[in-house]
């Protein structure tokens, strides 16, 4: 897929490692509507701080992104360097620096290699082409094992609207407002307020529902740019068109979010924790999140052990009131626990077979209300520890 | 050490595995003062529910404990079986069942093997001897690799008072009121209200400050029995004697708590996270606990990587306000981060050498107040995953 007006480029800039794409550019041939959802961590990387400011006018023309260095915990010097990288690009593209969004991912606390930018901005801009989207998706990978992109189109008000999304992230993933990095472009015609209105709930239901290891990054961000090329009548709040747009955006973000979970560091399985029968959505989410973050639950999944006791134990510390002897738990369509008690050995044997699959849904019914939420996670493997004991070396 | 009036026994009852001590008994030759701190998990094992009730009168004569089965999530049947085990023991000892405290540890959700109790209560009672304390400490081990005991004596009001403590626990350890299991006996003369008064703050500063994996067990408990044999004048609240007693009890609990962390599942290092300069104790604790529970921080310690960026990132999601650019972080006596910024490569190299040690203290100074708290944890290793992927098989 291509979207007219957008072009992309990526180069091997040697920011931290040689011989890999590590500097990417998303460019629109004119300033377009933009919105973002950025990390809620108190410790925010320099590019996050800059983007919060630059997104205020709801307008952007380019996203400059690097892997290899997060430019986080780098103080005034880190801010200064980030500004310099933007200015280098602005000069090369002959656009305003304020319309460039910056994004970094990689090791925290090390200075950004500004020389790598200086030497490579020119070839980066020269490489811009409408079919280079996936090269950028590759350039933003760190411990990811696969590139993560999503192409989607939907009819809004009788007009075809297109979306192209990418994401990266495999560890330090329990986004709170955004994942590590995700960029989506669309040709929808939409105002910046309406774009923000669509983005916030879409992020809440997608990136904010995944967890690999319970850690929230300093650099998390989702950025969306909409250039209006589809020429639909501009989307107004509260209309069917707004609902369709939000649905399509959420589809793209969910696809990317699940790709992140499936590629979680060391993950061998994707696990959906669905909590139903809660009194409130927030309680359902809290229970699901506590289970999804339990190291004991996640190692049991890795061991393909239908250890529902660990699930109930995790639920018990979630801080949400429920009656343990009303709880049902099933793996796929096999009920393991009914009214808080084991159904029996043969159900466990069937569940153990289900655990050999790559995608598993755990349903927890609290039977005390009508609210339901899902959280998406992966198992906790030996490779997770290997990857993270080793990441910087 | 022995304490007159107390005797101990343990047998191989075959509750889950053969050829290992798995049933233990702590017995006092008369009913004595007792207090407990039990799990705050909403999901409470049968013995926990029974003990909460039986501790109300502040009096007990025996503790019956088994490993191999937690008797948690077992409903009415589990309660019934627990009562039966107590009655079997009461009959054999010719004491009141209400004076027997019950304790179980092991797999959740499986029925307790009552026959193993029936067949072994008699040899268990026959084996009672004043020097069998460590046999009970062995009988309560599950994934523990070493028995954990602590002997301590202290002068209170001019009289020598003795303490004998044991604990077990290696995984599912983020106690909230208690660790998995810990039993302490003492010959102090003290009322039940005063004993409870001493126990609560002592648990708060010790077992409630350790975390192996962020999971709180359904079976956590600390039980203390005091038989008055030291013949000190009974300890009154608010006196020097009360302070001395509380200090001694806290010493014993801290010793046992740190032994649990050092023997954390798969642990290769013990790590103290000390947060200073906080505005409130609770904020210091919250920051320390968030860092101590971060999988990324813990895997970095396993990898002996002085990755302070992960520490700052974890702090950023702790929900506690602080200025990242005021934070100092040191490993041992090496300052790695000053005012939120890296001190430099040579400090990191020195810190990396410190990480090769078995016990490491991380000091985090928020520089925004005068409050300090410590949380104790261990690293997150490949073996943790192996142990927990494999525990039930």
UniProtKB/Swiss-Prot annotation, chains A, B:
Site described as Involved in the stabilization of negative charge on the oxyanion by the formation of the oxyanion hole, located at: 105-106
InterPro entries in the record, alphabetically?
Answer: Arg_biosynth_ArgJ, ArgJ-like_dom_sf, ArgJ_beta_C
**Lineage: superkingdom:** Bacteria
Which compartments does it reside in? Cytoplasm
Query: Which top-level enzyme class is recorded in the Swiss-Prot or TrEMBL entry?
Result: transferase
Recorded GO MF terms: glutamate N-acetyltransferase activity; L-glutamate N-acetyltransferase activity
**Protein's job:** Catalyzes two activities which are involved in the cyclic version of arginine biosynthesis: the synthesis of N-acetylglutamate from glutamate and acetyl-CoA as the acetyl donor, and of ornithine by transacetylation between N(2)-acetylornithine and glutamate.
The protein in question is named Arginine biosynthesis bifunctional protein ArgJ
Say which species the protein is native to: Desulfotalea psychrophila (strain LSv54 / DSM 12343)
């Amino acid at each position: 897929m291509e979207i007219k007006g957008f072009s992309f480029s990526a180069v091997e800039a040697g920011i931290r490692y040689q011989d890999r794409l590590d500097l990417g550019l998303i460019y629109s041939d004119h300033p377009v509507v933009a919105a973002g959802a950025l990390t809620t961590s108190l410790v925010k990387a320099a590019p996050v701080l800059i983007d919060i400011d630059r997104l205020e006018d709801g307008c952007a023309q380019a996203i400059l992104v690097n892997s290899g260095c997060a430019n986080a915990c780098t103080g005034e010097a880190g801010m200064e360097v980030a500004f310099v990288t933007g200015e280098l690009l602005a000069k090369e593209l002959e656009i305003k620096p304020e319309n460039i969004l910056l994004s970094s991912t990689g090791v925290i606390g090390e200075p950004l290699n500004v020389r790598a930018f200086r030497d490579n901005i020119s070839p980066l801009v020269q490489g811009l082409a409408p079919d280079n989207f996936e090269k950028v998706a590759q350039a933003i990978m760190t411990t990811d094992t696969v590139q993560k992109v999503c192409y989607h189109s939907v009819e809004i008000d009788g007009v075809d609207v297109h979306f192209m999304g990418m994401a990266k992230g495999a560890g330090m993933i329990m986004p709170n407002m955004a994942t590590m990095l995700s960029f989506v472009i669309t040709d929808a015609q939409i105002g910046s307020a309406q774009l923000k209105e669509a983005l916030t709930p879409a992020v809440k239901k997608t990136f904010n529902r995944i967890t690999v290891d319970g850690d929230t990054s300093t650099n998390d961000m989702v950025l969306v740019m909409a250039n209006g090329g589809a020429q639909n009548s501009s989307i107004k709040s509260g209309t069917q068109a707004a609902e369709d747009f939000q649905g399509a955006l959420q589809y793209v973000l969910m696809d990317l979010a699940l790709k992140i979970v499936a590629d979680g560091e060391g993950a061998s399985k994707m696990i959906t924790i669905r909590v139903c029968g809660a009194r409130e959505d927030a309680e359902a989410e809290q229970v699901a999140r506590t289970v999804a973050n339990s190291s004991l639950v996640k190692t049991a999944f890795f061991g393909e052990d239908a250890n529902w006791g660990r699930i109930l134990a995790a639920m018990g510390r979630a801080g949400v009131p429920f009656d343990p002897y009303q709880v049902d738990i099933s793996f796929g369509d096999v009920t393991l626990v009914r009214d808080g008690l084991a159904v029996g050995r043969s159900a466990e044997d069937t569940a153990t077979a289900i655990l050999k699959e790559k995608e598993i849904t755990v349903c927890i019914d609290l039977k005390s209300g009508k609210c339901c939420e899902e959280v998406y996670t992966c198992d906790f493997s030996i490779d997770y520890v290997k990857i993270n004991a080793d990441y910087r070396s």
